[in-house]
Amino acid sequence: MRESVAVKHPVGHKASQADDVIKSFVRSIDTAKRSEQPYCNWSLQACFPADTVDDILALPFEAPSLEGVSGKRELHNNTRKYFDVENRKDFPVCEAVAQAFQDKRLTSHIVKMFGTNLKGTYLRIEFAQDIDGFWLEPHTDLGVKVFTLLLYLSKDPSHKDLGTDIYDGDKKHLCRSAFAPNAAFVFVPSNNTYHGFEKRPIKGVRTSLIINYVTNEWRAREQLSFPETPIT
């Protein structure tokens, strides 16, 4: 059994609570900006309470080395981090965020706003830490993922150009989402939702959460927040 790791915070810091995350994210959904080009997507602001963002950034996970290889996240499956069962036990912020996105109050709002069907799916939250040399080839997420939320977290001003790259159906680069702390890019995967990350300099660590709901066909159950509990 792993020992729980204490994370230090400044005086006056409010510990992350699921209810606060739910309220904050519902507000961000209600004020989301929708775009139809090149596919339906949404831009969200102020997704989480500020203290929750700080709690996530304080997680004691080192950014893994790329060892000269990039292009697909699955190339580094052995070093990826998730808000999984173990990390939910060890870190209150992982538990708070996972409980929020498992909660009917939030899932029903996601269904209503984004038009996806979450019934019978499972929550998967990846804590992504990208370093210089990272890139991702264009891909759609179509298949076992029925919802994708890319939540940007790192606060380095130089990261403002490190948003998600967006492509058309022929994988031609069109534009890039804005990268700002606590902002997000959302889409419902389909056969044309091409996105990726063009290789460019990354100063420090580009930190984000990748939040998906996946179908029961998802094989890597250890990555799931609640592997035995589907969304109802």
Model-derived regions, located:
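Fe(II)/2-oxoglutarate
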Residues: 1-37, 174, 223-232
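Intrinsically disordered, low-complexity segments enriched in small/polar residues
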Residues: 10, 66-69, 161, 194
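Short N-terminal signal/transit or membrane-insertion segments
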Residues: 1-22, 79-91, 139-142, 146-147
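Membrane-targeting and insertion segments and their boundary/processing signals
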Residues: 13, 18, 22, 26-30, ...
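Catalytic core of non-heme Fe(II) oxygenases with the double-stranded beta-helix
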Residues: 89-102, 106-228
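Intrinsically disordered, low-complexity regions
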Residues: 13, 69-72, 170, 205
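Non-heme Fe(II)/2-oxoglutarate
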Residues: 21-24, 29-113
